[in-house]
């Protein structure tokens, strides 16, 4: 027997809401049944980006975006269920990550904020909603991120193999799975977030660097790369997590002030920043992995994947597709699985990863009735 969950994920790139319909058996083994994605309406994306970049939040704007994002989430769920002709009553729960608008695990007090009103989502879809996955880990002294390593361990662990699972989302994170069952994980720095922001800054008609054409037109600027790598996050020991609060267009433009560097050269150098920071992160692991498996939107960036393959050698590089999981849907599946963990009262965090004092069951629940 299995239960069906819908995992909803929207990352720091703020480009789309991904919905994964996942069958999960009694042992917690997931199987992707179907998926659907909805792009953010341009106005919603603009408002969310503005909110994430200001310290002066307006209550009405925050509340309005909370509702608007939940409505978009309900729409993607409805479209997904229509696609597969499955009724809402056949879904155990929606596991909604929400949209992160602030993540400050190192502030005093530490906090994180995800929007997407779960009550409206539950009533709008007729399905119970599990949400608020990050705050309990932070309350237990952790970073609240990354949360997917527990899922990676469940799905990707291989006996007598040391592997790394590297998510190339807005922010990159690595999960190390040792051959003896050990696990570590942490954010390594920016992946798509700076690359996408720089493309959009230079050409508002584009949302990302398709086929890395922009980056390939540029040349690596070693001095700029050196300045970028001086960001204090890279020198921090794990556990650690980051986000747009630290790696954003304002920070990048400060590094460019007084330097005449072409936009394409900047894009090429940002690509190298992602690849180098991942390479450096892997050198801190207790044991070098035999294979690095990549997932997330960054796997579609051919230049980034080329540089990672070159820099990580002799580590073998592949995507999670070779492990049976579509690299574009790993995170949405992971949150469906975290919803299953909540329903079955199983801890969803990994204290070795987040730095929490102990394992905790992640999330809270809103009933649809």
UniProtKB/Swiss-Prot annotation:
HAMAP family hit by this protein: AnhMurNAc_kinase
InterPro entries, alphabetized: Anhydro_N_Ac-Mur_kinase, ATPase_NBD
Gene Ontology biological-process entries: 1,6-anhydro-N-acetyl-beta-muramic acid catabolic process; amino sugar metabolic process; peptidoglycan turnover
EC number: 2.7.1.170
Binding residue positions for ATP: 11-18
PANTHER family xrefs: ANHYDRO-N-ACETYLMURAMIC ACID KINASE
Keywords, comma-separated and alphabetical: ATP-binding, Carbohydrate metabolism, Kinase, Nucleotide-binding, Transferase
Molecular-function GO terms, alphabetical: ATP binding; kinase activity; phosphotransferase activity, alcohol group as acceptor
Its biological purpose: Catalyzes the specific phosphorylation of 1,6-anhydro-N-acetylmuramic acid (anhMurNAc) with the simultaneous cleavage of the 1,6-anhydro ring, generating MurNAc-6-P. Is required for the utilization of anhMurNAc either imported from the medium or derived from its own cell wall murein, and thus plays a role in cell wall recycling.
Catalytic activity: 1,6-anhydro-N-acetyl-beta-muramate + ATP + H2O = N-acetyl-D-muramate 6-phosphate + ADP + H(+)
Coiled-coil segments on the chain, per record: none
Protein name, per record: Anhydro-N-acetylmuramic acid kinase
Pathway: Amino-sugar metabolism; 1,6-anhydro-N-acetylmuramate degradation; Cell wall biogenesis; peptidoglycan recycling
Family: Belongs to the anhydro-N-acetylmuramic acid kinase family.
Pfam family name, one: AnmK
């Amino acid at each position: 027997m299995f239960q069906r969950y819908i995992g909803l994920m929207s990352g720091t790139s703020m480009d789309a809401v991904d919905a994964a319909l996942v069958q999960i058996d009694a042992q917690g083994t997931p199987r992707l049944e179907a998926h659907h994605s909805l792009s953010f309406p341009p106005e919603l994306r603009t408002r969310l980006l503005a909110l994430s970049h200001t310290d002066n939040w307006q209550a009405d704007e925050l509340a309005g975006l909370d509702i608007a994002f939940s409505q978009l989430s309900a729409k993607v769920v409805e479209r997904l269920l229509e696609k597969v002709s499955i009724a809402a009553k056949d879904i155990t729960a929606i596991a909604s990550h929400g949209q992160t608008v602030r993540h400050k695990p190192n502030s005093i007090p530490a906090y994180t904020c995800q929007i997407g009103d779960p009550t409206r989502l539950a009533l709008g879809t007729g399905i119970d909603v599990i949400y608020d996955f990050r705050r309990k880990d932070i309350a237990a002294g952790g970073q609240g991120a990354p949360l997917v390593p527990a899922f990676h361990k469940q799905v990707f662990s291989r006996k007598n193999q040391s592997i790394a699972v590297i998510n190339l989302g807005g922010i990159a994170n690595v999960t190390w799975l040792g051959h003896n069952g050990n696990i570590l994980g942490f954010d390594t720095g920016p992946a798509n977030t700076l690359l996408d922001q720089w493309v959009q800054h230079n050409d508002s008609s584009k949302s990302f660097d398709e086929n890395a054409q922009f980056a390939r037109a540029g040349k690596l600027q070693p001095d700029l790369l050196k300045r970028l790598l001086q960001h204090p996050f890279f020198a921090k020991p794990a556990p650690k997590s980051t986000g747009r609060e630290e790696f954003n267009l304002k920070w990048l433009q400060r590094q460019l002030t007084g330097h005449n560097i072409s936009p394409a050269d900047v894009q090429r150098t940002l690509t190298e920043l992602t690849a180098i920071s991942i390479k450096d992160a892997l050198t801190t692991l207790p044991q070098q992995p035999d294979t690095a498996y990549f997932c997330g939107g960054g796997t579609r960036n051919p230049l980034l994947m080329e540089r990672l393959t070159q820099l990580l050698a002799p580590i073998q590089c592949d995507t999670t597709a070779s492990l049976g999981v579509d690299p574009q849907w790993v995170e949405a599946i992971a949150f469906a699985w975290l919803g299953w963990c909540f329903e079955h009262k199983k801890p969803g965090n990994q204290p070795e990863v987040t730095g929490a004092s102990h394992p905790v069951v992640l999330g809270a629940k809103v009933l649809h009735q």
